[in-house]
């Protein structure tokens, strides 16, 4: 459980770092206004630009697919995996339908989440083997 939780934190940090590096606007943003706000490091209303303003990669897709992949490898239970996969799919669709992310931003987030989920599971597995 500790490895899973630390993986969630690591996954979130990776997402924040990528958002700050890529600085891709969300689809509902006016590209011109977004560029001006970034240039002046200011939102309309004088609050600073935060990582949450950026859309690439989708943090929700990344986190949900991280959990799904980790749980798949940890439990190897098809019913639980299907439940998590269904919830993850609904979350990804919701992010697109509500215009919070483009399809590409969601796909990239999902891929990164899958990769980190497998990496964290493998790391946890090696730690358990070393304890024996």
Regions found by a protein language model. Give the residues of each.
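Generic marker of "main functional regions" within proteins
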Residues: 2, 19, 28-32, 106-108
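Transmembrane alpha-helix/helix-exit interface in multi-pass inner-membrane proteins
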Residues: 8, 12-29
């Amino acid at each position: 459980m500790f490895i899973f939780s630390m993986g969630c934190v690591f996954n979130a940090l990776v997402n924040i770092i990528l958002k700050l590096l890529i600085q891709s606007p969300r689809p509902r943003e006016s590209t011109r206004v977004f560029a001006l706000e970034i240039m002046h490091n200011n939102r309309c209303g004088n609050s600073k630009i935060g990582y949450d303003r950026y859309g690439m990669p989708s943090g929700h897709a990344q986190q949900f697919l991280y959990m799904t992949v980790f749980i798949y490898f940890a439990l190897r239970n098809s019913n639980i995996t299907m439940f998590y996969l269904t919830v993850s799919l609904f979350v990804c669709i919701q992010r697109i339908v509500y215009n919070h992310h483009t399809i590409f931003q969601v796909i990239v987030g999902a891929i990164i989440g899958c990769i980190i989920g497998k990496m964290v599971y493998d790391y946890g597995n090696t730690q358990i083997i070393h304890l024996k």
